[in-house]
């Protein structure tokens, strides 16, 4: 599954276009490598996303084309959250 689609379906990022912009700015990495919006995501991958002053690392649990809002958080596990610049 494409990175931008995963981020939107899992609701880590609200819109797919925003996920693409964030990836194009170099703020997302997959398993330590900088990722593009079109990069493939697989279960077991570790994603690191920089949201402003926060760095969030998650592990991909499962991939779904669509999901209910209540079940979206089951698609990933948060491994680490850290604040930057403090």
Curated annotation (Swiss-Prot):
Query: Quick one: a GO cellular component term?
Result: RQC complex
UniProt keyword Coiled coil, yes or no: no
- Function in brief: Key component of the ribosome quality control system (RQC), a ribosome-associated complex that mediates the extraction of incompletely synthesized nascent chains from stalled ribosomes and their subsequent degradation. RqcH recruits Ala-charged tRNA, and with RqcP directs the elongation of stalled nascent chains on 50S ribosomal subunits, leading to non-templated C-terminal alanine extensions (Ala tail). The Ala tail promotes nascent chain degradation. RqcP is associated with the translocation-like movement of the peptidyl-tRNA from the A-site into the P-site.
Give the species this sequence originates from: Bacillus subtilis (strain 168)
Q: How does it assemble?
A: Associates with stalled 50S ribosomal subunits. Binds to RqcH, 23S rRNA and the P-site tRNA. Does not require RqcH for association with 50S subunits. Crystallized 50S subunits are variously associated with an A/P-site tRNA with or without RqcH, as well as with P- and E-site tRNAs but no RqcH. Displaced from the 50S subunit by puromycin but not thiostrepton.
- HAMAP family reported for this sequence: RqcP (MF_00871)
> What are the disulfide bonds?
none
Observed phenotype of the null mutant: Not essential; synthetic growth defects can be seen in double rqcP-ssrA mutants. Double rqcH-rqcP deletion strains grow normally in rich media. Loss of Ala tailing, RqcH is still recruited to the 50S ribosomal subunit. In vivo mild decrease in tRNA(Ala)-binding by RqcH.
The record ties this protein, via SUPFAM superfamilies, to: Alpha-L RNA-binding motif
Q: Which UniProt keywords apply?
A: Protein biosynthesis, RNA-binding, rRNA-binding, tRNA-binding
Q: What is the effect of changing residue 16 to A?
A: Synthetic growth defect with ssrA deletion, loss of interaction with 50S subunit, loss of Ala tailing in vitro
Show where the S4 RNA-binding domain sits. Answer: 1-62
An individual GO BP term:
rescue of stalled ribosome
Q: Does the keyword S-adenosyl-L-methionine apply?
A: no
Protein name, entry field: RQC P-site tRNA stabilizing factor
């Amino acid at each position: 599954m494409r990175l931008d689609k995963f981020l939107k379906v899992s609701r880590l990022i609200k819109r797919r276009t925003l996920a693409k912009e964030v990836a194009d700015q170099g703020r997302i990495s997959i398993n330590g490598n900088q990722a593009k919006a079109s990069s493939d995501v697989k279960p077991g991958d570790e994603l690191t996303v920089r949201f402003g002053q926060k760095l969030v690392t998650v592990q991909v649990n499962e991939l779904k084309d669509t999901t209910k809002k209540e079940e979206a958080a089951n698609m990933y596990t948060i491994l680490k959250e850290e604040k930057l610049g403090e």
